[in-house]
A protein has these predicted regions:
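Alpha-helical cap/lid subdomain in secreted, periplasmic
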Residues: 33-38, 57-188
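Serine-esterase "nucleophile elbow" of acetyl-processing enzymes
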Residues: 2-52, 59-68
Length: 188
């Protein structure tokens, strides 16, 4: 965790392996690269590899209590999708996380998540629609899924074909930074 002077804006990133620097040193992950680019902002990485929305929801209250972030970035849902969890349960968990963040005074950003096409068009569409519906219902910014530009480039992916590699991290940082910067500016 990075500590900044009192009064500095703070951002909590609640994510899964895509934000937890899976398969590399944490210092090489996009969240640390973002810290390096935004030194006046306290960026707390509450991401855990393998995390589902249910796990994130369980951990969020204590993270909000200890961090009191100005901005909450929710990058969860991928593991729910890969496990074929119900879009209804996904929506319920994400709804509660958004409401928790907002009731604690945080500006919430929701990262869109998509599942691979082999899960079938109906499930894929229902799953993805959850993110769009929640962004509309709760008036939160929906950050387009960064993996749509990373995953098609084999040289940016780890051998498992699921996780972005170290070379992808600066690209993810540049994808996420404008959204987070704007939210921090508007939270002041």
């Amino acid at each position: 965790m990075l500590h900044n002077p009192a009064g500095a804006a703070s951002v909590l990133i609640l994510g899964d392996s895509l934000s937890a620097a899976y398969g590399m040193q944490e210092s090489k992950g996009w969240v640390q690269l973002l810290r390096d680019e935004m030194p006046s902002v306290e960026i707390i990485n509450g991401s855990v590899s393998g995390e589902t929305t249910a796990g994130g929801l369980r951990r969020l209250p204590s993270l909000l209590d200890s961090a009191t972030p100005d901005v909450l970035v929710i990058e969860l849902g991928g593991n729910d999708g890969l496990r074929g969890f119900s879009p209804k349960q996904l929506k319920s968990n994400l709804t509660k996380m958004i409401e928790l963040g907002q009731s604690n005074g945080a500006t919430v950003l929701l990262t869109e998540i998509m599942v691979p096409p082999n899960y079938g068009p109906r499930y894929s569409q229902m799953f993805n629609q959850v993110f769009h519906d929640l962004a509309d219902d709760y008036d939160v910014a929906l950050i387009p899924f960064f993996m749509t530009v990373i995953a098609p480039q084999a040289d940016l992916m780890q051998r498992d074909g699921i996780h972005p590699n170290e070379a992808a991290q600066p690209k993810i940082t540049q994808w996420m930074k404008p959204w987070i910067s704007e939210a921090v500016t508007n939270a002041d």
